Swiss-Prot record:
Disulfide bonds: none annotated. InterPro entries: Helicase/UvrB_N (IPR006935), Helicase_ATP-bd (IPR014001), Helicase_C-like (IPR001650), P-loop_NTPase (IPR027417), UVR_dom (IPR001943), UVR_dom_sf (IPR036876), UvrB (IPR004807), UvrB_inter (IPR041471). The beta-hairpin motif is involved in DNA binding. This is UvrABC system protein B. It comes from Lactobacillus gasseri (strain ATCC 33323 / DSM 20243 / BCRC 14619 / CIP 102991 / JCM 1131 / KCTC 3163 / NCIMB 11718 / NCTC 13722 / AM63). Residues 31-188 form the Helicase ATP-binding domain. Forms a heterotetramer with UvrA during the search for lesions. Interacts with UvrC in an incision complex. Belongs to the UvrB family.
Length: 671
């Protein structure tokens, strides 16, 4: 069993001091929580330093903190910022580890069963393991998470009870340690040493913990006693330092043992028999035969190898929960007295609320047609009311708080003044006729000043067509769409800041928290098309993207001014007048935010090294002209031949694949 260290304190490191109206916001929020307020709202205009205010509140309250945001791009951005603010504390990243996920489903209309299919990102899985191990072992932890934190994660009590703790001088035989490691799902592999594995060389056992990316532990035995434990680089074997004691956390969050498995199998069999009788009684013989066959197969797999595809659907039985009882989630890994910060709460809270309903509808169809047992419904995200029961103290952070937050509390703190003196952007409404030509002219002005541009459209088709049109004009442009993978999204934002391209076009991905100070123009096409993406809150958020640059300007292309546009414009002008008044009183000249460009997610790669070592894999072939592609094919062919000479066949194969991809594109253009 492991004990959580409770004496660690958060240490905020920043060259900045609270400025503008940050100081009063920090004081009001901290005082409110210390006086017992359960919920508070920080209504902060874009660019006023809400993240810095959040960091100060965390440091002053000194409680384990969960920061939830509604999309992975923002989670990555916040994670990078909090790591800089708290370099001596544990800052963790927790999002869904699927790069690709096709949930199991059944479509009755066409009698189509869709098998679950997924692709797991190993780096994110490692970061998730680091999160839970940090929460179990220390109190100075900040976890930055997406809404996946309300999905099932296994029982934290079983997880903690399964931790293997070893120390120098401990009497334990090598074979007992190996058996303990196997029990917590570590694999022995003496050749391919990876996370969640161990290897044995005589009296030396090397363990690669699931939550580490490049460090392992070497345990040296003398007879039946641990002689020494050293931390080593998992790749080179270089000794990093000696350790008196280490805790090895399970390689899976869903810890089980023989006793739990046998109890679960008996419970699953009972439920299967009840469901078979129910279907037979209703005359649904196909469904009865289907559920019996599928469940029996799963039970045999679980009995023989301890696992089956879709084992998460039996989580209620594995954890011994009652029907309808909520699953264990990341929130259960926190101590009772913890703090929750909801970033961009107007978007995050509706998403938290929607998770359960969407999951439930899909699973009910699988149950009705005999593909899953009714207990599959209990492998689910938390309902909103279940999430609320976990809340000790919570702070909602947004430039435009939603109705839910406003109904939860009347303790609202406003933060309008930016430390840099920056004003809310000027807003201009221009007619739709000739909007593209007008936009091109505005883009070229920004390119001449080495500034960046955001363009938000209403449809995917328009975004794609506009991207192609601007490319043909020689403008460096990218289109940020929903199919782009998590870490690639962050790279695109980073490349925009670095100036690898000048214009980013999107639909709904540009609104909340995409923090690019270099952006001086935000163009909103079809601003008068009233609807979800052109209502007041989204418009205010979109306007805010230009508020981090002293030349910030927003152009709305519209033939009329809707109520939503009027509200957004009025709110912006109100803040702008307050900011101008503050600047005048204090003699402040607005200046663009200077923000370092960093490799947002990776905790293992050096961002500068990545910057210098440009790889062909980072290139977007779609942006190249036909002539550039042909030149690139020649260059890559030479590199491939060079790699083959050096016997670096993996690099040669990667280059070959890139060449084939380019040749295919050139060939298609000829057609």
């Amino acid at each position: 069993m492991i004990r959580r260290q409770k004496n660690k304190k958060f240490e905020l490191v920043s060259k900045f001091q609270p400025a503008g109206d940050q100081e009063q916001a920090i004081k009001k929020l901290t005082d409110g929580f210390e006086q017992g307020e359960k919920a508070q709202i920080l209504e902060g205009a874009t660019g006023t330093g809400k993240t810095f205010t959040m960091a100060n509140v965390i440091a002053k309250l000194n409680k384990p903190t969960l920061v939830i945001s509604h999309n992975k791009t923002l989670v990555g951005q916040l994670y990078g910022e909090f790591k800089e603010f708290f370099p001596k504390n544990a800052v963790d990243y927790f999002v869904s580890y699927y790069d690709y996920y096709q949930p199991e489903a059944y479509v009755p209309q066409s009698d189509t069963y869709i098998e679950k299919d997924s692709s797991i990102n190993d780096e994110i899985d490692q970061l998730r393991h680091k999160t839970t191990s940090d929460l179990m072992s220390r109190n100075d932890v900040i976890v930055v998470a997406s809404v996946s934190c309300i999905y099932g994660l296994g029982d934290p009590r079983e997880y903690a009870a399964s931790v293997v703790s070893i120390s120098g001088g401990q009497e334990i035989s090598r074979d007992v340690l190996l058996r303990d490691l196997v029990n917590i799902q570590y694999d022995r592999n003496d050749i391919d040493f990876q996370r969640g594995r161990f290897r044995v060389r005589g009296d030396v056992v090397e363990i690669f913990p699931a939550g580490y990316s490049d460090h392992a532990f070497r345990v040296e035995f003398f007879g039946d006693e641990i002689d020494r434990i050293v931390e080593v680089n998992s790749l080179t074997g270089e000794v990093i330092g000696e350790r008196e004691q280490v805790s090895i956390f399970p390689a899976t969050h869903f810890v089980t043992n023989e006793q739990i498995m046998q109890r679960a199998l008996a419970s699953i069999k009972d439920e299967m028999n009840i469901q078979v009788k129910k279907f037979e009684g209703e005359g649904k013989l196909l469904e009865a035969q289907r559920i019996k066959q599928r469940t029996t197969y799963d039970m045999e797999m679980m009995s023989e190898v301890g696992y089956t595809n879709g084992i998460e659907n039996y989580s209620r039985h594995m954890e011994g929960r009652k029907a309808g009882q909520p699953p264990h989630t990341l929130l259960d890994f926190f101590p009772d007295d913890f703090l929750i910060l909801i970033d961009e709460s107007h978007a995050t809270m509706p998403e938290l609320k929607a998770m359960y309903n969407g999951d439930s509808a899909r699973k009910q169809t699988l149950i009705d047609y005999g593909f899953r047992l009714p207990s599959a419904l209990d492998n689910r995200p938390l309902k909103l009311e279940e999430f609320e029961k976990h809340v000790n103290q919570i702070m909602y952070v947004s430039a435009t708080p939603g109705d839910y937050e406003l109904n939860q509390t009347d303790h609202k703190v406003e933060q309008i003044i930016r430390p840099t003196g920056l004003l809310d952007p000027e807003i201009e409404v221009r007619p739709i006729k000739g909007q593209i030509d007008d936009l091109v002219g505005e883009i070229n002005k920004r390119i001449d000043r080495n500034e960046r541009v955001f363009v938000t459209t209403l449809t995917k088709k328009m975004a794609e067509d506009l991207t192609d049109y601007l490319k043909d004009l020689g403008i460096k442009v990218r289109y940020l769409h929903s199919d782009i993978k998590t870490l690639e999204r962050l790279e695109i934002i980073r490349d925009l800041r670095l100036g690898k391209f000048d214009v980013l076009i999107g639909i709904n991905l540009l609104r909340e928290g995409i923090d690019v100070p270099e952006v001086s123009l935000v163009a909103i096409l079809d601003a008068d098309k009233e609807g979800f993406l052109r209502s007041t809150r989204p418009l205010v958020q979109t306007i805010g993207r230009a508020a981090r640059n002293s030349n910030g300007k927003v152009i709305m292309y519209a033939d009329s001014i809707t109520d939503s546009m009027r509200e957004a414009i009025d709110a912006t002008e109100r803040r702008r007048s307050l900011q101008m008044k503050f600047n005048k009183e204090h003699g402040i000249t607005p200046k663009t935010i200077v923000k370092p460009i960093r490799d947002v997610i990776s905790i293992t790669k050096d961002s500068d090294e990545k910057e210098n070592k440009e790889s062909f894999a980072d290139l977007n072939f779609d942006e190249l002209t036909k002539k550039q592609k042909q030149t690139m094919i020649k260059t890559l062919t030479a590199q491939m031949q060079e790699a083959a000479k050096k016997l670096d066949f993996e690099e040669a194969a990667n280059l070959r694949d890139a060449i084939m991809d380019l040749q295919k594109q050139v060939h298609e253009k000829k057609k």
